Amino acid sequence: MGKLVVSLDGVVIKEVQITKDKTTLGRRPYNDIVIDNLAVSGEHAVLQMVGQDVFIEDLNSTNGIYVKSKRVRRQHLNDGDVVVIGKHELIYMDERARFGRGHFAEAHAQPRPDEDA
């Protein structure tokens, strides 16, 4: 399961768990993730869960969505990807990847050559 951390000018505004197959994002109040800013279209983008993967898709917004500084129409999100919409940054955090790098990875790590076995 993943989450988005939404920030503006480096200040975290909200954190949203991605739990639905489709999560809408836009300026209008009926969206699942509301960003009240004129640079954000009323119905700007949708996050889609496909199995364990999360994709973001632009819904023909005026200002687009950017991932890794490139304007994209549809993009698979990886842990740590930064999505830019207007002046807002949305950081995608994949909790599976974080667990894999943490507890599981440490438990199965091979000792370094300079460590005593």
Regions found by a protein language model. Give the residues of each.
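Regulatory inter-domain linker segments that are low-complexity and enriched
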Residues: 1-6, 88-117
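Forkhead-associated
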Residues: 5-8, 12-87
